[in-house]
């Protein structure tokens, strides 16, 4: 569905991401997909960033950090009180010293056993982790400023990570992020033994930020398996493996916990804005980790690392796409090379991006009708929307019985709750009057040249 146009597209491989959470305040953090780009300059992000084309992000209010200096609060009175308390604590410590030793010994043994298990798992699984280099054509200009495609050459634009999840019939297949491979004229994959091979892009999907690559299985000795991300619990140990900052630090292992499940992030992609479900983790995720696996302690893929909060005052907030969302996308990309989605055929803008005087004076909206819904800028000729009688400057306020406030909500309902061939009811406002239209959803025809 080609709803959002170029004004929503991001530069290079960097995307704007916002945390969304119900009933939070209007503060927002900017975040970025974690792909290493050698030519990318550091960019500053403020608390609020204006976005064009109706890119709407929710927010997460994190409050005010309060730091208490240490060692500056002692007085004579508190020193005496502390001394008195120390005597009590000393007695308590003495009476439980043997138990403490047992507890400490038991804890150390547990940590050693747990650490050994993780080390064994990482050692076993590392051959399935790969580095991915995105090569893009760069024209060589002559002294007179002219350029020729004949003199262009592929140069490294960025790099990321991936994981081999399937091997059959002499081929191996890698899952990674779409933003790792997007725009590439060719792709190189670095394997565990140092071998570098050319990869073929089987298919990619910008709205879920996933892609599948194919390589020869000549040097592939290990395949990782998907786990069940619905079994994840907050506080559970997870491990991230990838190539932060490129191949020099290949297969770097970081450990953390599941900080939260069923988070929602609203992300601007080259295909428009979308909201995706993610796992939050504090396992260190750095530029170049994109596309690498988030693993449980059994060595199963429970997520694909995709993005992180990137702010000076923020530490340890990274996100991974859950394995249960990754698997069906990977399977469809393998079988069809693309994700087939229902198509309406409108170019749209969140209504709140339209000036209120235009909403009132031109669109005929008033009161509670203002700033809620999706403004149709253009209806594609021959599209399902045109056949259903939708027109430019209509406002979509409902789909399949659910209220619509933003394009992201419309897209989520359309892609998750409907399928090609369905006939759905669309509620609209036209000149301030509410009406309902029935649209038979179709698949967008790919342009051919």
Curated annotation (Swiss-Prot):
Keyword Hydrolase on entry: yes
Localisation per UniProt entry: Cell membrane
UniProt xrefs under CDD domains: cpPDZ_BsHtra-like
GO cellular-component term (any): plasma membrane
Catalytic-site annotation from UniProt: 179, 209, 290
Function: Degrades abnormal exported proteins and responsible for the propeptide processing of a natural pro-protein and for the maturation of a native protein. It also plays a prominent role in stress (heat shock, ethanol, puromycin and NaCl) resistance during active exponential growth.
Similarity annotation: Belongs to the peptidase S1C family.
Note: Inactivation results in compensating overexpression of YtvA, especially during stress conditions.
Name of this chain's protein: Serine protease Do-like HtrA
Taxonomic lineage: Bacteria, Bacillati, Bacillota, Bacilli, Bacillales
